[in-house]
């Protein structure tokens, strides 16, 4: 009989997911959403269940996956904020420092890095802990298998979680489903190539059609999502390389993927980073 169950909390901002993995008494939240308000809603779901929140596990250092961590921690002071590696912790600190410098944390000031200038900010170095292994065990029973040895892909460093009890792979942002993928600032061409290779590796490892694939953005799927993501990334590179302007590249991706969410942010920033307009500026 399965010990663990998984619930998806679908965030509205960025179409990002948080997941609650729980047994009868304890829970782990995987990723904490993009804003304080939605994280507070997530906290209420956990509180209403009557379970103890054991940990907030952040899969990688992009803000839509960790901005809500302080809100959850304040709701559940005994919960640990965990990452899989020192590299992911460093990514989180560095990204937050950069976001503060360009004003991207002005709407979420509680997550500005703590400093003399922002004494009420978040103490990333002190509050985020490194798991220190490849297994996270829930109090009350149930193991999560953590992997973080991926090369740079959608993020510089990334962790996935496999839940054997549920035959479920939580891919974080290695997969998106019905949502345009982030290939913007920081995602180099070589990282996209790595990403395609990693998806091939995951397809081979999780070939069982009964495996549930939980993406970082969008609805649950199955192992066919790995190939669909590879095609999407190939189409994206073909669009930004094959069109004369960013507008044309955007239009091509919209035609290929009608109904996909995040055209105005994730796709737009990705095209702006890789597209013909950026190449023209570099050549000038």
Q: What do the predicted segments below correspond to?
A:
Residues 2-48, 160-173:
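Conserved beta-strand hairpin/beta-sheet module of binuclear metal-dependent hydrolase folds
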Residues 9, 21, 133-139:
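Short acidic-hydrophobic surface loop/beta-edge motif
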Residues 25-26, 51-53, 77-80, 142, ...:
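Loop/turn elements at helix/coil->beta-strand transitions in domains of secreted/extracellular proteins
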Residues 28-31, 55-59, 145-146:
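Short catalytic-loop micro-motif centered on adjacent basic/acidic residues
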Residues 34, 143, 148-228, 235:
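Metallo-beta-lactamase
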Residues 38-39, 64-67, 91-92, 179-180, ...:
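Extracytoplasmic/secreted cell-surface and envelope-processing proteins
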Residues 48-137:
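Active-site HxH/HxHxD metal-binding segment of metal-dependent hydrolases
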Residues 153, 204-212, 219-284:
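Accessory terminal helices/loops
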């Amino acid at each position: 009989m399965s010990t663990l169950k998984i619930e998806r909390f679908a965030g509205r901002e960025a179409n990002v997911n948080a997941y609650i993995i729980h047994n009868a008494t304890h829970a782990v939240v995987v990723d904490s959403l993009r804003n304080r308000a939605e994280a507070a809603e997530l906290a209420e779901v956990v509180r209403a269940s009557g379970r103890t929140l054991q940990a907030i596990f952040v899969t990688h250092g992009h803000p839509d996956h960790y901005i809500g961590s302080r809100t959850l921690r304040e709701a559940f002071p005994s919960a640990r904020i965990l990452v899989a590696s020192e590299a992911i912790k460093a990514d989180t600190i560095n990204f937050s420092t950069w976001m503060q410098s360009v004003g991207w944390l002005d709407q979420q000031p509680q997550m500005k890095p703590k400093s003399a200038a922002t004494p009420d900010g978040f103490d990333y170095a002190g509050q985020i802990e490194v798991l220190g292994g490849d297994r996270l065990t829930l109090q009350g029973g149930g193991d999560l298998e953590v992997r973080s040895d991926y090369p740079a892909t959608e993020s510089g460093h990334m962790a996935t979680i496999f839940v054997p009890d549920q035959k479920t792979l939580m891919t974080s942002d290695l997969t998106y489903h019905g949502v345009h993928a982030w290939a913007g600032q920081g995602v180099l061409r070589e990282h996209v190539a790595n990403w395609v290779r990693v998806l091939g590796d995951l397809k081979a490892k999780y070939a069982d059609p009964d495996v549930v694939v939980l993406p970082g953005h969008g609805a649950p799927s199955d192992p066919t999502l790995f190939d669909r993501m590879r095609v999407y990334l190939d189409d994206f590179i073909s669009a930004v390389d094959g069109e004369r302007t960013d507008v044309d590249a955007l239009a091509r991706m919209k035609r290929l993927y009608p109904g996909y969410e995040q055209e105005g942010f994730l796709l737009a920033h990705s095209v702006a980073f890789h597209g013909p307009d950026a190449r023209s500026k570099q050549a000038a």
